[in-house]
Regions:
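Catalytic core of nucleotidyl cyclases, primarily class III adenylyl/guanylyl cyclases
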Residues: 121-146, 165-204
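Intrinsically disordered, glycine/charged-rich C-terminal tails and inter-domain linkers
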Residues: 1-67, 220-272
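Short, hydrophobic/amphipathic alpha-helical packing segments
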Residues: 107-114, 154-162
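Catalytic NTP-binding/metal-coordinating core of nucleotidyl cyclase/transferase enzymes
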Residues: 69-149
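Short, glycine/acidic-rich beta->alpha junctions
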Residues: 106, 205-206
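Catalytic/regulatory signature loops of cyclic-dinucleotide turnover enzymes
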Residues: 184, 206-231
Length: 272
């Protein structure tokens, strides 16, 4: 794969992210990419196993912190966000083959643990859409750091699935879970709508739509990212990804200016 690290600054000043040039994307874009922070994955996995065992035994789930308070402070305005869309693989077949109680356990466990993983990387859960979790990382400042956080979060999600959730599920002869992940960035509008007498805050924008579409390109336990995320994240992460060769007749979102390339993650042993 081509080494682009020597052209980071030139690329970031000339090429767009989510329909905008990087200079427009954020006025505080770092010129010196800081090395991504690390987390204690063993602690995260241990906590995951504890919560999953409790859920299997008692049917008790823990709610992740809501992002409504943050968004309410930006109603009717725009935020630059990195959006992570994580989708549960095979859920349609689960609805046809599993008892309702077991289906509920698996989907609730998935959404619970993906949500907690997001929070460990200073991200926020926007909402749940069926069996998918939509999360975001505010990127008005420190865009590169937030790209790193989203990539680290996606890696952690896959580890949490295999080493946290599935290790407990196997103890009870349950099938393991897998996910497909898409990550994109862009400017988003924060809106409020009323459902009955209750106000709800939501986010609309390119990044959410495209992150969902990117996830459909992923294989199970794979991450697919936009060109903006690829060139925004730390160069050390790029060896873990390879550019996808997409047929523009079938994938209509490739655009010379707005989306010139899409990258997929390599298996861990290939990206090390």
């Amino acid at each position: 794969m081509q080494d682009n690290t020597g052209n980071d600054h030139k690329y970031q000043s000339q090429n767009p992210i989510g329909g905008e040039s990087l200079s427009e994307m954020t006025s505080t874009l770092q010129h010196d990419l800081t090395f991504p922070q690390t987390v204690d994955m063993q602690a995260i996995i241990s906590e995951t196993r504890e919560r999953v065992r409790r859920a299997v035994k008692t049917g008790t789930f823990i709610s992740a912190e809501s992002s409504d308070e943050l968004l309410r402070g930006h109603l009717n305005s725009k935020l630059k966000l990195i959006v992570l869309y994580v989708d549960l693989v095979g859920s349609t077949m689960m609805t046809r083959s599993l008892p309702v109680a077991q289906l509920a356990l698996m989907v609730q466990t998935f959404t619970q643990e993906m949500s907690f993983t997001v929070s460990r990387f200073n991200g926020y859960v926007l909402k749940y859409v069926g069996d998918a979790v939509i999360a975001y990382f505010p990127a008005d400042a420190n865009y590169n750091d937030k790209c790193n956080a989203a990539i680290n979060c996606s890696d952690a999600m896959i580890q949490v699935l295999e080493e946290g959730i599935n290790s407990v599920f196997r103890e009870h002869d349950y099938e393991g879970l897998q996910a497909k992940i898409g990550i994109e960035s862009g400017e988003h509008s924060v809106i409020q709508y009323i459902l009955g007498s209750n106000p709800h805050v939501d986010v609309l924008g390119y990044g959410i739509s495209m992150a969902a579409k990117l996830s459909t390109l992923a294989r199970p336990n794979q991450v697919v990212i936009s060109h903006g995320i690829y060139f925004g994240m730390h160069p050390s992460f790029r060896k873990k990804f390879v550019q996808m060769d997409l047929d523009p007749q079938r994938w209509k979102y490739i655009h010379e200016r707005f989306q010139p390339g899409v990258w997929r993650s390599l298996p861990l042993e290939d990206g090390e």
